[in-house]
Curated annotation (Swiss-Prot):
Biased composition (Low complexity): 310-333
Domain C2 per the UniProt entry, residue ranges: 1-112
Signal peptide: none
Name used for this protein in its record: Probable E3 ubiquitin-protein ligase hulA
Residue ranges with Polar residues bias: 151-168, 177-202, 217-226, 253-270, 295-309
Enzyme class at the top of the EC tree: transferase
PROSITE patterns referenced in this protein's UniProt entry, alphabetically: C2 (PS50004), HECT (PS50237), WW_DOMAIN_1 (PS01159), WW_DOMAIN_2 (PS50020)
Keyword Ligase: no
Gene from which the chain derives: hulA
Length: 816
């Protein structure tokens, strides 16, 4: 071939950049360099670019070629060049005559997918080069002393890898790189935050994340346009830290996965946002806790009971209403023997039972209906027991019966300084057919809310905000007041909305709107997790806002304020965040919601022999605002190799760094605000799953929607096991359903549009039930994939027993 080559160089090859290279090491980025060869006779090498998956060289090489010449360009990791595989990262083979006419001349920009070599190592990414017959301009490499060429045939096969000068190999599968990479930007401007779009604007499914840290291809388009043209006024295109494209609407300070249409209409967009917000508001207002579920403030429970129960014989509609609310009927006729009616100085009637020498607010002629938890004949979880107060006898020592302002009976235990809806003279409704975890949660809740530190102080705390400026106004109002003032009765007033509310509906609306605003990724304080696009985690790059620590303290105060005043926030965090709030140690399982790829790599490291396969040290590479630095996981860590003996310690330290250490400043600021209202020793009575419910409440889950958007593997919907599964779920109350949702998906959060929008770690992922496991084993869950591994249990009773144990007794969020 050499005899057919011209005597002088006739083609200039510019190796511009590579994009989205494969990251073979868990925490170490490669040091890429490129080697260009023609027929094994001419070899040129670029400089080494340190610690990157997207190296930029822009180096020129002049070659002697003909139309049949094969140009081969390989990329290697300089750190591993002396290893067996030489740190191979990919190759392209280009036949010169296929891309440029040497006789006519020309200039061609090429973007080619990197291919595998003969050893079949995994390869990702693209290589961008330029071929030109114009050699009249000076070679900038030669001018800068960077041109390292070997014009004679290589005699050292160990120095430069041998390349098969054949036609390009077929791609091993669909290209993993961004198809828009044909016009790469050589100096892309990256937004320093790694935020992700909020699903609260236009609920949409984000595309799957590129695998193994691959970033989307950079183009020479500005951030205000994309391949479809220029974005509407006020819109910007960004990319999150998983390479997913999202769009920022600066007009409304919101984000979305969905590209705005070219005929974007602000009025239409506003209407869509309002409709979406109304759906979320309705879902938020339906959330409750177990203690609330026994009260008249639980509309969903009342509705369910009205459907599940019929009035007693001879009963009326008012009797059904009484059963749903726990109220009493008006007494008529004479008082029973030994009873007397008296009046307090304030004019309130009460009744004296001289038979037992006790007093009560309740007219003994009234009939009280007591709500009892347990299984009835129909298999429902709630039954109503009718019991005349006069037949119950006296209250135990130290107990008192009182009425709420809606005439509902409750009981005060002065021995423990607690209150309860449950009549102590009846068999405990907490212990009849109620799962252990539920007894524990309800008792914890009663204990928690009865503590002196959680009692509302005398006086009022006035907060006035504007709806369209709620974040800034709330920050100013809440941060100017002392913690003791915030513990007074909270009176929320929206500017321009006069009316007497006593803080009830306004408080609920206030926390709903504020939680939507302050957790919006637009502000770079929080970002959506790797698991989905609706659970939150602290943004490690929140320092882009110089006041971020003050804002985290404010957010901590708001979360504490919501718990203190028994309101819910419309936001849900990764499981590890709740663990951190309880000062619990995070584990490898918690990594699933933060970085699914890293979780998989670390799990593989623990389960396999790594000697001679993976070269790691006790150090990690971290990039912050474009600067990459090496962080020691322990003193001198970068010089300590990871071995089979110490890999367990390595995994623990990596997990601690990735989840806790990177956001330690922000989290400590958050907790300083939170603990001003909620003492740490009190909140620690809950576990992490209960804390999620305490902050966000328990959702009213639509089982029909859940079932409709479920896939099956190994099962069919008509199988008896599946029929029994849904039958059991329908009989469970809202809390048990939320626990099941936590067990299988990692959160009790349901997307605004229902289960059809359920997300996994790799994009949209429907709830899935897979036939897996021995009938003697418990069900298992894969929270990253919203999957439940359900063994083929023989009977309904066995299925319910096994499922209940798995859901109730399992700690943590991820099971695998």
């Amino acid at each position: 071939m050499g005899s057919n080559l011209p005597a002088q160089p006739n083609l200039r090859v510019t190796i511009i950049a590579a994009d989205g290279l494969y990251k073979r090491d868990v925490f170490r980025f490669p040091d890429p360099f490129a080697v260009a060869t023609v027929g094994g006779e001419q070899t040129h090498t670029t400089s080494v670019i340190k610690k990157t998956l997207n190296p930029y060289w822009n180096e020129m090489f002049d070659l002697r070629v003909n139309e049949d010449s094969i140009l081969a360009i390989q990329i290697f990791d300089q750190k591993k060049f002396k290893k067996k595989d030489q740190g191979f990262l990919g190759v392209i083979n280009v036949r010169i005559g296929d891309v440029i006419d040497l006789q006519m001349g020309g200039d061609e920009m090429l973007t080619r997918d990197l291919k595998k070599s003969n050893d079949n190592l995994v390869v990702h990414g693209k290589l961008i080069i330029n071929l030109s017959t114009n050699l009249s301009t000076p070679n900038t490499n030669q001018a800068n002393g960077l041109h390292r060429s070997h014009m004679q045939p290589s005699t050292s096969s160990g120095l430069v890898p041998q390349v098969s000068a054949s036609t390009p190999q077929p791609s091993p599968g669909p290209s993993q790189a961004d198809p828009t990479a044909s016009n790469p930007s050589l100096h892309p401007q990256r937004v320093p935050s790694t935020t992700r779009p909020s699903s609260t604007i236009v609920p949409a499914n984000g595309p799957p994340a590129p695998p193994n840290g691959q970033q989307g291809s950079r183009t020479n388009l500005s951030s205000f346009e994309d391949s479809q043209g220029r974005l509407p006024a006020g819109w910007e295109r960004r990319e999150d830290n998983l390479g997913r494209t999202y769009y920022v609407d600066h007009n409304t300070r919101t984000t979305t996965w969905t590209r705005p249409s070219n005929n974007y209409n602000e009025q239409t967009s506003r209407t869509q946002r309002e409709a979406s917000m109304q759906l979320e508001r309705r879902a938020h207002q339906s959330r409750m806790l177990p203690e609330d579920r026994t009260g008249a403030s639980s509309p969903n429970l009342q509705e369910n009971q009205q459907q599940a129960q019929t009035p007693p014989a001879g009963g009326s509609a008012s009797a059904v209403s009484m059963m749903a609310t726990g109220a009493t009927t008006a007494g008529t006729g004479e008082l029973p023997p030994g009873w007397e009616q008296r009046t307090t100085p304030e004019g309130r009637p009460y009744f004296v039972d001289h038979n037992t020498r006790t007093t009560t607010w309740v007219d003994p002629r009234r009939q009280q209906y007591i709500r009892m938890y347990g299984q009835n004949a129909n298999g429902t979880n709630t039954t109503i027991q009718q019991q005349p107060v006069s037949q119950l006898g006296p209250l135990p020592s130290g107990w008192e019966m009182r009425l709420t302002n809606t005439a509902r009976v409750y009981f005060v235990d002065h021995n423990t300084k607690t209150t309860t809806w449950d009549d102590p003279r009846l068999p405990s409704s907490l212990d009849q057919g109620v799962p252990q975890y539920k007894r524990d949660f309800r008792r914890k809740l009663i204990y928690f809310r009865s503590q002196p530190a959680l009692r509302i102080m005398s006086g009022q705390c006035h907060v006035k905000v504007r709806r369209n400026n709620i974040f800034e106004d709330s920050y100013a109002e809440i941060m100017r007041q002392s913690a003791s003032d915030l513990k007074k009765r909270l009176m929320i007033k929206f500017d321009g909305e006069d009316g007497l509310d006593y803080g009830g509906l306004s408080r609920r609306e206030f926390f709903f709107l504020l939680s939507h605003e302050m957790f919006n990724p637009f502000y770079c304080l929080f970002e959506y997790s790797a698991h989905d696009n609706y659970t939150l985690q602290i943004n490690p790059h929140s320092g882009v806002n110089p006041e971020h620590l003050n804002y985290f303290k404010f957010i901590g105060r708001v979360v504490g304020l919501a718990i203190f005043h028994r309101r819910f926030l419309d936001s849900f965090f990764i499981g590890a965040f709740y663990k951190m709030m309880l000062r619990k140690k995070v584990s490898l399982q918690d990594m699933e919601g933060v970085d699914e790829d890293l979780h998989r790599n670390l799990t593989w490291t623990l389960d396999n022999d790594i000697e001679g396969i993976i070269e790691l040290t006790f150090a990690v590479d971290d990039e912050k605002f474009g600067e990459r630095r090496t962080i020691d996981l322990k003193p001198g860590g970068r010089d300590i190799p990871v071995t089979n003996e110490n890999k367990g310690e390595y995994v623990e330290l990596v997990t601690e760094w990735k989840i806790v250490k990177r956001v330690e400043e922000q989290f400590n600021a958050f907790m300083s605000g939170f603990n001003e209202l909620i003492p740490a020793d009190l909140v620690n009575v809950f576990d992490e799953r209960e804390l999620e419910l305490l902050i966000g409440g328990i959702a009213d889950i639509d089982v029909d929607d859940w079932k409709k958007h479920t896939d099956y593997r190994g099962y069919q919907e008509s199988d008896e096991v599946i029929q029994n599964f849904w039958k059991i779920v329908r009989t469970w109350d809202a809390e048990q359903k939320s626990r099941l949702l936590q067990f299988t998906t990692g959160t009790s959060r349901i997307p605004v549009n229902g289960f059809k929008d359920l997300q996994g770690s790799d994009g949209p992922r429907r709830f899935t039930i897979e036939k897996s496991g021995d009938p003697g084993a418990l069900p298992k869950s894969h929270t990253c994939f919203n999957r439940l591994d359900l063994p083929p249990y023989k009977t309904n009773d066995v299925l319910e027993h096994k499922l209940s144990i798995a859901v109730e007794e399992t700690l943590g969020f991820g099971q695998e």
